Design a protein with these regions (language model features):
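Buried hydrophobic residues that stabilize the cores of well-folded domains
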Residues: 4-206
């Protein structure tokens, strides 16, 4: 039965209040940057298997950024004194155009705010941690709709993520599931995307 979104009101308020806050937010975040790292492609998992779930392999480190012919797919990670990622800059096909994601850490919560290359807000996300220190819920509010992800673990290992999707009027649309299979040594083997109608392998370790 499709229902209404369970997206927290606070998240909706944040999405609206942060809509035009790019410059101010970037100024505040940048004050806390102590180092940066550059990669071609995504390198760090923001949530469990975040880039694998989007069908990508892990990015490669870039030693000398000035030697690159293009900034397309260049990911720059900015860290604070606690070695936490507080900003990600993602290069686009257009020369020297970037998407930005900012990170704010609170008790049992990680908040991300994403903007496009025109400083328009893309989404705000809440990642909620459980007593095991692992992400249990992710709520996202974006310009095109919202989503709720629930993470299920067994023996401290992620087994599946159930993804509920809602349109911009908060009416529930599709429910997806990502299921995770592991090698005998505990490394990720594959990810299967399934709906009520079909399933497909979206990531396969070779």
């Amino acid at each position: 039965l499709k229902g209404n979104t369970m997206i927290p009101d606070k998240l909706k308020d944040d999405f609206n209040s942060l809509r035009n806050m790019f410059d101010e937010l970037k100024r505040e975040i940048d004050k806390n940057v102590v180092r940066e790292e550059n990669y071609k492609g995504e390198f760090y998992e923001i949530s469990p298997y975040s880039y694998q779930r989007n069908r990508f392999k892990q990015g490669k480190i870039v030693g000398n950024v000035t030697s690159l012919k293009t900034t397309n797919n260049l990911f720059t990670y900015y860290f604070d004194v606690k070695n936490q990622i507080i900003e990600i800059r993602e290069g686009l096909e257009l020369k020297n155009q970037f998407y930005y994601t900012f990170f704010i850490y609170e008790k049992e919560l990680m908040k991300t705010i994403a903007y496009d290359n025109s400083k328009r807000i893309v989404n705000v996300r809440y990642y909620l941690y459980g007593s095991n220190g692992k992400i249990e819920k992710m709520y996202s509010k974006g310009s095109r709709g919202s989503r709720e992800e629930t993470y299920f673990y067994e023996n401290d290992r992620l087994q599946k993520i159930v993804i509920r999707q809602f349109d911009r009027n908060d009416i529930e649309q599709d429910t997806l599931q990502h299921s995770f299979d592991y090698k005998s040594n505990g490394e990720l083997k594959s990810i299967i995307l399934s709906t009520e109608l079909y399933s497909e392998t979206i990531y396969q370790e070779t």
